């Protein structure tokens, strides 16, 4: 899991972040801005400065924030001038938007704020519907509202073309000021609080956020159009409120609460996907009438509040259907404020000590948690350059109390005669050295004038003063007006209470801010490191803390000398690994030395037998197929030479006759877990069972028992085949539709034309982890992608998951998580009485079903894919369905088996909508996460980077469709260093880089592109070349080998690109190769492997079968027939690492064993018994 950060501000307006895997507060670059409050999400942080202005901090990323501006140039044909800008009075504008209703000239487009810059000039889009247009980009139609085509016809009276220009957001890793409302008729309304959330309401547009703000006048404002491509939004909209608001908070979903001046809380209702601003307000009374609510914070299903007496309250019964909740529960502790982060985790700032606290024990079943625990990590060694004498006074306006001059100060005040650099330097020291104190509420008494000033005292030595003034930066270069004398009020607004400095808490003579003047620079720095920082605000909206996440926030390393700390820092993981290897080699040498002395003795036992028995269930072969109880026995024989052979016996009863079947484990090709809610089962394949598509299936009573048998049988198979250690760089990797990862070591003659061995004899072994796809290369660099689009890099280990101890490598095994969605469908039929309802015809599908409609799936009976998965969300309507939906998520059709669309017509008698629920798996494997960009597709050059330091080409597609090139990937550093963004005009879905750095990609509209001039010196190339797709086909995947290019379209057709040469790498034409293909992988020697559907077995058709193309030669890149391997239930395969040289002997054509393509059947596709894809 990648690290996330917790945000906080101290009493001097400085902003800090704390990483979930860190042990130190890191200062954030504030510039000259001091902050009152911050509200963070993962991608950014919004803040309110002490000047009551809104600021935005966007994290830097390798992926730029780009926004596409577009306009259309329209022309009409006339007999005199031909096509020209002279249009009819009833026509649209010459320059307009896509509808033609808005006038949009090129010169009218301006940058929305100083935080943007133009990426390029205007240019013409020469693409329409995935096909390239003629030069100039014109598309033609009979009239403007008609359908446009790229071909000019005799009746094409109008034409248009699209102009594109991109602008890029440049203010990243810095605070960008957001303007207030732009109504010149009204006075500016200073902001007092801000909150960010709402990212779970809808994902259209991508990265949409709800930003709410409260002003000093008690008004509520909503920021429009905040999303990934427009991080700062567009404008402010005021919402009417029944009373004045002092503070506001919104959660990830549709919860929004605000606290009022009268002490009540106010809840926004009606927030949904179509109305993110909500519709009405509801008042919620305070827990106690005498102490009103002064602060609220909301999450997904929780609301926390702090009342004026600093008591903390938890609101029970809160959810999307009841945002007001049912009642208040008082919690232990006194807080200045609380904040609810991700997963409803809670953070707070203590009232007395101003420390940041974390609520321990918060789980989905116990949302209120158990106890508060203080975060005690120190702050980083930052030197403030922007603090002024007004810093303390600005911070004081949050809390209403003051910082007083200590009565027994040993040195008289000299502030009136001090220069500004000296004041700034002393203020800098005081910012990190204030000690917390006991709090005395001052709500009843008016602060005295002398209590409203912070008296700072200086040492009279010129040397110390000049030394400190050097650190004050730019402040020393500007002169300021006279410092206000003691007794003058410094602020007027009161927000929260601040802690007084208690003399009893100071140590020695360090009793107050005035004592700081006696320190030299070095002494002051050591003093600062030992003091406790005073915090005013904390935000956990971007901090993800799981229940199993180990945090290092609650302990400090003490008692180590400087030399010991230096020694511990010098011990790296590489040193540890080297020591382990050295110890292992020494133990192995000693063991060998001791055993060699006795090898000449005769063995007492020539052969040993080891037997394990147990009770399982077996899915019998004959009809009716059902599970029956059996006894199993695993016999392992060890010969005198140490070789081991194993046999598995399955004893069953047929009628009244006792029978058995046996399996030689040296013939087993794969062991596949098939865990589901009904049975803890696994499948055993042999070459014969692979041909039949009917494995031997055994089931255990518990999941642990199933894992024990899988480990035992796997180890026996490894010993029979003398396999151990990690996979080689030549290995073939594959992934099942359940996310299980398997790897096979190819034989040297696998790609030979004279090889008589079928690929159904290949042995596959499981590697720990859970992935959606894997991409390998012959250099040993392997990457994988999870279902949640997280990228993982292979560490070189083996095992993990349920493989313990000796079955797994001790090094390079790390925790891994993955998240995916489970979908069910709600179906309805129209009738003239009730309209659409859940009452269907007797022949209709289930009203709650899976996608096929054949299996009933309700919200109650639908379980996670296996016991290893757990739900992490509730059911919600999924609007991202192919074909689109209406505002409520429905899709319409004439009947259930027909195609669906997102709008209702008079002929639509049925409708459906998809519900989704997220689940998560926690496992382990030889994988390390590559943050922070989520990826959709990935490709590694199969043959580059032969040397350890030579760069390896790696390209990827982000889950938003951006094309990326990974820099710094080598054998020694397989994860690389950074991403390089490659500009495109539209989102992409697939990319592949060949052995000679040929880069091909597929756009979301199904068009193909070739990237020109890619080289080690220019890893991103220079431009895209649009390649026409096969006629009326939308492509969805591409794979490039050494000299060949293959693509798969959305209908499962495999296409081969003809005419590719070094001088013309784009090729000339497409040729159809096969159908029923799901995925294709082309190796470094142009080997062709695919995942095919509808492969005939002995019992049914099999979907998701590994197939290998036979007869591939340098002069015959298409091969001649298919060889079928393991399956079904497979989702992905990669042979990009297999560089085993194929034999050059040509096989006579008449001797070639021709196998038919995967059959195209009119009936249903039956899945294998391994997994239901």
Curated annotation (Swiss-Prot):
Residues 424-434 have a biased composition (Polar residues). It comes from the Eukaryota. Residues 403-489, 1147-1173 are annotated as: Disordered. The keyword Repeat applies. InterPro entries: Beta-propeller_rpt_TECPR, Peroxin/Ferlin, PH-like_dom_sf, PH_domain, TECPR1-like_DysF, Tectonin_beta-propeller. Keywords: Autophagy, Cytoplasmic vesicle, Lipid-binding, Lysosome, Membrane, Repeat. Residues 409-422 have a biased composition (Low complexity). GO terms for biological process: autophagosome maturation; autophagy. GO terms for cellular component: autophagosome membrane; cytoplasmic vesicle; lysosomal membrane. Its main location: membrane. It is found in: Cytoplasmic vesicle, Autophagosome membrane; Lysosome membrane. TECPR repeats lie at residues 209-240, 254-285, 301-332, 344-376, 730-757, 952-983, 997-1028, 1043-1074, 1086-1126. One of its GO terms (molecular function) is phosphatidylinositol-3-phosphate binding. Residues 609-718 form the PH domain. Tethering factor involved in autophagy. Involved in autophagosome maturation by promoting the autophagosome fusion with lysosomes. Binds phosphatidylinositol-3-phosphate (PtdIns(3)P) present at the surface of autophagosomes. Belongs to the TECPR1 family. PANTHER family: DYSFERLIN-RELATED, TECTONIN BETA-PROPELLER REPEAT-CONTAINING PROTEIN 1. The PH domain mediates the binding to phosphatidylinositol-3-phosphate (PtdIns(3)P). This is Tectonin beta-propeller repeat-containing protein 1. It comes from Xenopus tropicalis. The gene is tecpr1.
